[in-house]
Amino acid sequence: MFDIIIIGSGPAGLSAAIYAKRANLNVAVAEKEYEGTGQIAESGNVNNYLGFPNINGYDLGEKFREHAVSLDVEFIEKEAVQIEAVQNGEKEESVIYRVKFDDDTIAEARALIYTAGAYPRKAGVPGEDEYTGKGVSYCAICDGAFYKGKTAAVLGGGDTALDDALYLSDICEKVYLVHR
């Protein structure tokens, strides 16, 4: 039994794992398949992470993973398909978390941290994948500085699109807001 199972191996999951290991806890990180460390792996140049100026997002994610590996964090390379909280004893707040994986194996822990992350809603336009990280971006705050003094377009239909367009209007020469 683990003290903590962390589902997701992006920056949040690996950070949680590092802190848990430093606290001498028995921790495992479950990841469906290793494709870099979350969304950051798809970022081009990352220039806003302290201590690593102008690093490629994939390389920065690799440094996160190397840090976790150096502390002997255990990785479970399987997809978590079911999570169940099971009563453990008489106290209502005392539970054990059972995580079932895609190969029907089960791991148990006293605590569970879910950091599976998010994926951007892509537009599906030609060239989008080819230019991701090379002009196509999904985070105005993360990547806005790359467009300083340039013309930019924000594609979206909700509050985030408007917030991003307003944020970029202080950085960019001109900003177009394209409503989906």
Task: State what each model feature region is.
Residues 33-57:
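Conserved N-terminal glycine-rich FAD pyrophosphate-binding loop of Rossmann-like flavoproteins
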Residues 1-7, 23, 35, 42, ...:
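FAD-binding core/adjacent interface of flavoenzyme oxidoreductases
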Residues 58-75:
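Helical element adjacent to the flavin cofactor pocket in flavoenzyme catalytic cores
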